[in-house]
């Protein structure tokens, strides 16, 4: 098995791709001579190309294909491109497929790869009939486990047991330099904790956002009582929401530089003493940089979405959570969390007693 070609299937989303990386690092450490190829969609393509344990990254252009197939003019060209994609995939002659995604499209890719060993999860742990495409099925425990643990357990299909895993996201030097310049400009003091706050989410995950006024009051208190430097981070669509919070604050805060990649964002978090935010991809990036995280959970599962490293969970049980109800208008689970709850959690994880 040492010289095998292995295909990894975890196509999206960014947070789930990130949570698969520790498993691949462990696999490479235990089987150092294997060649690892990963099929992934944007925006995770650049992130994976920067990670040394991955030998090749193949971009899966799902959105472009979905657009092309809509018109008669573009349909045949798109179908031809799909056929070529599959032919090129089969030419790689993969020995093993690890399907971490567990949905129909990853199952189809696994089958069309032509690999003789296709490792996936058993029926109850997959969706859309994915289990039909694997010939080695890994059974997961009935109790809830984190996504990190779920991914580690798939390696049992290769006879690997994961214990005490360690992981740090690799940041290329070209992504370290611009962030270093930003932090050097503010001469961070060893006596002032730098706290990164990421209040936003993607447009599809607004139901996970804590209240902006609560973030503003919390940030003020962190400055006033902990003498913290507050650094707000944001995604492409989140700047307006961050500015609303900053304008409502009475104390000064900083806006992190716009990051061009997930690894640049990781470098920002590496230089901070703490991350505060919701259950998002950036939270998992911070945890994989070794930065302690304080996570505000509303409608999502705090066990399944547990961070990798040192963390503290802030959550209120309101009877209906976790539910992942994207259309919920009440958001009782988030409104029940007060600034005092997050402030206490912050002091606890930082080891501060005042």
What is each PLM-predicted segment?
Residues 1-354:
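Catalytic machinery of carbohydrate-active enzymes
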């Amino acid at each position: 098995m040492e010289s095998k070609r292995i295909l990894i299937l975890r196509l999206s989303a960014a947070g789930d791709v990130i949570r698969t990386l520790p498993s691949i690092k462990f696999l490479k450490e235990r089987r150092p001579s294997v060649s690892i190829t990963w099929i992934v969609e944007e925006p995770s393509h650049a992130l994976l190309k920067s990670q040394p344990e991955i030998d090749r990254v193949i971009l899966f252009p799902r959105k472009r294909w979905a657009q092309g197939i809509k018109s008669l003019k573009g349909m045949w060209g798109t179908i031809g491109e799909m056929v070529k994609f599959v032919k090129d995939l089969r030419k790689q002659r993969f020995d093993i497929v690890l399907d971490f995604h567990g949905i129909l499209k990853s199952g189809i890719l696994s089958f069309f790869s032509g690999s003789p060993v296709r490792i996936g999860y058993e029926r109850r742990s997959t969706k859309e009939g994915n289990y039909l495409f694997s010939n080695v099925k890994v059974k997961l425990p009935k109790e809830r486990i984190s996504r990190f643990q779920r991914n580690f357990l798939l390696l049992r299909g290769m006879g690997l047991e994961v214990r005490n895993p360690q992981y740090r996201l690799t940041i290329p030097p070209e992504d370290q330099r611009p962030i270093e310049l930003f932090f050097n400009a503010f001469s961070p003091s060893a006596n002032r904790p730098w706290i990164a706050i990421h209040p936003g989410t993607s447009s599809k995950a607004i139901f996970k956002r804590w209240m902006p006024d609560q973030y503003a009051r919390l940030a003020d208190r962190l400055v006033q009582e902990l003498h913290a430097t507050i650094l707000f981070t944001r995604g492409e669509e989140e700047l307006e929401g961050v500015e609303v919070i900053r304008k409502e604050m009475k104390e000064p805060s900083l806006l992190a530089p716009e990051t061009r990649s997930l690894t640049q964002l990781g470098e920002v978090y590496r230089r901070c003493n703490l991350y505060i935010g919701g259950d998002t991809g950036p939270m998992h990036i911070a945890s994989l940089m070794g930065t302690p995280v304080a996570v505000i959970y509303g409608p999502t599962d705090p066990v399944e979405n547990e961070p990798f490293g040192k963390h503290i969970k802030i959550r209120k049980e309101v009877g209906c959570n976790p539910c992942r109800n994207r259309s919920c208008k009440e958001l009782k689970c988030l409104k029940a969390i007060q600034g005092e709850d997050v402030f206490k959690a912050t002091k606890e994880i930082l080891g501060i007693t005042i």
